[in-house]
């Protein structure tokens, strides 16, 4: 049985049998993996709380026939405790891990840039660097951008004029008055500015005012359209 070591973030867990769990981890070098942590649900488990969601861990993995097995796990950064202590941060963290879980649809596909973005977002939540809602919304848009779904916001996607008046999610960006389609929604300059700031991670803009409800809805709709399924944690926050 061959072994490999990597650093990763625990995205989610699910029960297996009476004492085990399947741990889903986004790793730095091996992409998303699913591995069994044996005995982790026992009171005296050798893993302790190191394999809980939002934990950043160094893991030693044994390759298995159907599922790999976690042999060792050491904490690198305990994001879980400070995030769980603040409900808004906890909600945002759930949005973040659900988003990357959906983006990383193929196991073992290396996603180093996505991994760095994930670490940055969870670290910001744990340190309360910015408003949790803004961190979560910005993460969603930046993760989608890394996956290839960046909205075109500067010029009309039809004619190229720098006269953005509408936004069409299906067309991938803004449209001018003359060329907008029936699905496009009118977008005010301040909404466009805040939406753009989320994508760029411009905290000078995002720290100045809470993310507007209409902008939150744009993030939710953009994610659902390009992932082809809703980000349920985001929908719960926005409801």
Curated annotation (Swiss-Prot):
UniProt keywords, alphabetically: DNA damage, DNA recombination, DNA repair
GO cellular component assignments: bacterial nucleoid
GO biological process: DNA recombination; double-strand break repair
Coiled-coil annotated residue ranges, if any: none
Keyword Ribonucleoprotein in annotation: no
Keyword Chaperone: no
InterPro entries: ARFGAP/RecO, DNA_rep/recomb_RecO_N, NA-bd_OB-fold, RecO, RecO_C
Task of the protein: Involved in DNA repair and RecF pathway recombination.
Family stated for the protein in its record: Belongs to the RecO family.
Protein name, UniProt field: DNA repair protein RecO
Organism of derivation: Bifidobacterium longum (strain NCC 2705)
């Amino acid at each position: 049985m061959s072994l490999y070591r990597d650093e990763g973030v625990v995205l989610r867990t699910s029960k297996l049998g009476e004492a085990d769990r399947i741990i889903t981890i986004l790793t730095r070098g091996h992409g998303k993996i699913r591995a069994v942590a044996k005995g982790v649900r026992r009171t005296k488990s050798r893993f302790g709380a190191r394999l809980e969601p939002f934990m950043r861990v160094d893991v030693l993995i044994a390759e298995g026939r159907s599922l790999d097995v976690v042999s060792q796990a050491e904490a690198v950064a305990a994001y879980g405790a400070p995030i769980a202590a603040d409900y808004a941060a906890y909600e945002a963290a759930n949005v973040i891990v659900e988003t990357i879980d959906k983006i990383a649809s193929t196991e073992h596909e290396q996603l180093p840039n996505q991994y760095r973005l994930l670490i940055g977002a969870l670290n910001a939540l744990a340190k309360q660097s910015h408003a949790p809602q803004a961190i979560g919304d910005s993460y969603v848009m930046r993760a989608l951008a890394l996956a290839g779904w960046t909205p075109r916001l500067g010029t009309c996607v039809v004619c190229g004029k720098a006269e953005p008046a509408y936004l069409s999610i299906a067309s991938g960006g803004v449209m001018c008055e003359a060329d907008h389609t029936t699905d496009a929604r009118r977008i005010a300059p301040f909404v466009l500015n805040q939406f753009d700031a989320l994508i760029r991670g411009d905290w000078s803009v995002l720290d100045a005012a809470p993310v507007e409800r209409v902008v939150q809805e744009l993030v939710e709709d953009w994610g659902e359209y390009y992932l082809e399924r809703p980000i349920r944690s985001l929908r719960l926050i926005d409801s």
